[in-house]
Amino acid sequence: MSEFTKIAILGGSFDPVHKGHIQIVKQAKSDLDLDKVILLPCQRSPHKDNNTIANERQRVEMLSLASNQHDWIEISDWELNQENPSYSLLAARHFKETYPEAILYWIIGNDQWKKITTWYNIAELAELITFIVFTRDKECPLDLSLIHI
């Protein structure tokens, strides 16, 4: 284990949660030697159409069932208790305050990476966390020019 606690956050509607979500966090844990992954269900993403089918309690329960074999996965309802819209920056500030000595990572898909410059106050967010970007099998490689936010 490193000198600092390494924590990654995966936010999303998780409606429904699926094997891909768990595969991603397992891969991130393995590749980066993460100590913890926080699954952060949101009320409403400002970047997606949100017509959720499952309610908040059901989505948290789905996450709990999907992750119960992994003691390094934590489910946080913090964002569910915030006002809309739900910005990643506010969650990053919260977790930086909660874990001041930790190195924080934010897991996103290539679809969101392509829109990263439209995220609320992205410059401050990028100072608080390091992005982990996953691509789907058939997606083209990352546009690394976006790294210079």
Tell what function each PLM region has.
Residues 19, 44-130:
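N-terminal Rossmann-like or analogous alpha/beta NTP/dinucleotide-binding catalytic cores
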Residues 147-149:
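Conserved small/polar residues in nucleotide/adenosyl-binding loops
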Residues 4-33, 38-43:
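N-terminal catalytic cores of NTP/NDP-binding nucleotidyl/phosphoryl-transfer enzymes
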Residues 47, 138-144:
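Short, charged/polar "capping" segments at the starts of alpha-helices
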Residues 1-2, 98:
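Short, flexible hinge/linker loops that cap or flank conserved catalytic cores
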Residues 110, 135-137:
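Short secondary-structure boundary segments
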Residues 87, 144-145:
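Generic structural signal for alpha-helix starts
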Residues 38-41, 131-135:
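Short internal beta-strands
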